[in-house]
Amino acid sequence: VVGGDECNINEHRFLVAIFNSNGFVCSGTLINQEWVLTAAHCDSTDFQIKLGAHSKKVLNEDEQIRNPKEKFICPNKKNDEVLDKDIMLIKLDSRVSNSEHIAPLSLPSSPPSVGSVCHIMGWGSITPIEVTFPDVPHCAYINLLDDAACQPGYPEVLPEYRTLCAGILEGGKDTCNYDSGGPLICNGQFQGIVSYGAHPCGQSLKPGIYTKVFDYNDWIQSIIAGNTAATCPP
């Protein structure tokens, strides 16, 4: 996250870190005791999930590590289009209990409204061009913009991709490299998943692109309920 500050250690209990043998890959969001939501483009062969983390150097006593037991990507996702249905649901290999730094964030009860203030967070780069990893997650507040605000900067993002456009039009605050998969929280509701953006991060007229969680509520709830053949909206 560029243009932000260190997150309050108690305000991201649902934020998880996804890492593999090469190191930190992505963030994700705990949505109940055994399921995490992230971006499909965060998938890799050997990743693990760390819950309850804040600082990379000073570990929280209640940090937990889980492996993915099952991973679900929309069966109707166009695989050659990385921005299409950029959402992945992960079942953990064992449940996690709520603790001081671990608690889920529920799915949105209504779609987000343009103009709402949204919270972004992650362990991604805090500088826009070269990648600078912070020791702690950084947080910032941005605005949910009309889809038309992202159209000029991102002609490749098609309307059927079910995305949200969020940022600051004049630039300066944005998610950045390695923030992928983390949450966009608007008016307290989990509305987006960090998917795509410009490089360098935080450019004017190039807000961030987020997967619209609300459109996938039915698919997510079906998978969790055991209907593993459920498909996503077109």
From Swiss-Prot:
Compartments, record wording: Secreted
MF annotations from Gene Ontology: serine-type endopeptidase activity; toxin activity
S-S pairs: 7-139, 26-42, 74-232, 118-186, 150-165, 176-201
Keywords: Blood coagulation cascade activating toxin, Disulfide bond, Hemostasis impairing toxin, Hydrolase, Protease, Secreted, Serine protease, Toxin
Modification note: Not glycosylated.
Activity regulation statement: Strongly inhibited by diisopropylfluorophosphate (DFP) and to a lesser extent by PMSF, benzamidine and 4,6-diamidino-2-phenylindole. Low inhibition by hirudin.
One Pfam family recorded for the sequence: Trypsin
Residues in Peptidase S1 domain copies: 1-225
Main localization of the protein described in the UniProt heading: secreted
GO cellular component: extracellular region; secretory granule
Record's keyword annotation contains Secreted: yes
Tissue expression summary: Expressed by the venom gland.
EC number(s) per entry: 3.4.21.-
Annotated SUPFAM superfamilies: Trypsin-like serine proteases
Keyword Ligase: no
CDD domains, A to Z: Tryp_SPc
Family the UniProt entry places it in: Belongs to the peptidase S1 family. Snake venom subfamily.
Summary of the function given for this chain in its UniProt record: Thrombin-like snake venom serine protease that cleaves beta chain of fibrinogen (FGB), releasing fibrinopeptide B. Has a coagulant activity activating blood coagulation factors V (F5) and XIII (F13A1).
Name by which UniProt lists this protein: Thrombin-like enzyme contortrixobin
Organism whose genome encodes this protein: Agkistrodon contortrix contortrix
